């Protein structure tokens, strides 16, 4: 998610791993090197400004979308516990360059969700989050009842994404939006 037009949240620290200060991170990014390649990262605790920290190592957990990372100065479980729920950020001006029709998945958050009904576009909700354990899923809050539905982010169901105009169009199969 884009945070104050300056930061992009690329990961969430979910828990500790072991006793030597390693951290488990849920990735919100398509760029694995953010959690593998040593270097400077930014960490944000709730309601605090981001702070600089150095990633010393990282690896992807086999078969999962989570990473185990080691940060400089975090050497035991007690220190690691204090970082649970922290966000890992990158500056938006440091995002990798994409091709013309490409976009960062996190740019989908807060887009209006529209459907085509009787040749007319109808706004039905907005993207409030992403789930990406195995496949990318849009978490959409429906305006009519405030319920949350998961929409598979595949071309057949989401044929159009218009970042510039802040919306996407879905073509849901029967029953997908029924709650």
Swiss-Prot record:
Domain PRC barrel: start-end pairs: 100-176
Gene3D superfamilies named in the record: PRC-barrel domain, RimM
Localization, UniProt: Cytoplasm
Gene Ontology CC entries for this record: cytoplasm; ribosome
Highest taxon above the source species: Bacteria
Keywords: Chaperone, Cytoplasm, Ribosome biogenesis, rRNA processing
SUPFAM superfamilies, per the entry: PRC-barrel domain, Translation proteins
Known partners and oligomeric status: Binds ribosomal protein uS19.
Domain notes: The PRC barrel domain binds ribosomal protein uS19.
Function (record text): An accessory protein needed during the final step in the assembly of 30S ribosomal subunit, possibly for assembly of the head region. Essential for efficient processing of 16S rRNA. May be needed both before and after RbfA during the maturation of 16S rRNA. It has affinity for free ribosomal 30S subunits but not for 70S ribosomes.
This protein's name: Ribosome maturation factor RimM
């Amino acid at each position: 998610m884009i945070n104050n037009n300056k930061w992009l949240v690329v990961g969430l620290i979910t828990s500790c791993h072991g006793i030597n200060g390693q951290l488990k991170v849920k990735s919100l990014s398509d760029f694995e090197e953010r959690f593998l390649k040593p270097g400077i990262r930014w960490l944000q605790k709730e309601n605090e400004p981001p702070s600089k920290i150095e990633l010393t190592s990282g690896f992807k957990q086999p078969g999962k979308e989570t990473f185990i990372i080691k940060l400089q100065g975090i050497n035991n479980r007690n220190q690691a516990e204090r970082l649970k729920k922290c966000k890992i950020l990158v500056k938006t001006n440091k995002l990798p360059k994409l091709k013309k029709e490409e976009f960062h998945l996190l740019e989908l958050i807060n887009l209006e969700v529209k459907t085509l009904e009787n040749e007319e576009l109808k706004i039905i909700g907005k993207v409030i989050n992403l789930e990406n354990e195995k496949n990318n899923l849009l978490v959409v809050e429906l305006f009519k009842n405030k319920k949350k539905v998961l929409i598979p982010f595949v071309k057949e169901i989401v044929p159009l994404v218009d970042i510039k105009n802040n919306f996407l169009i879905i073509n849901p199969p029967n029953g997908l939006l029924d709650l």
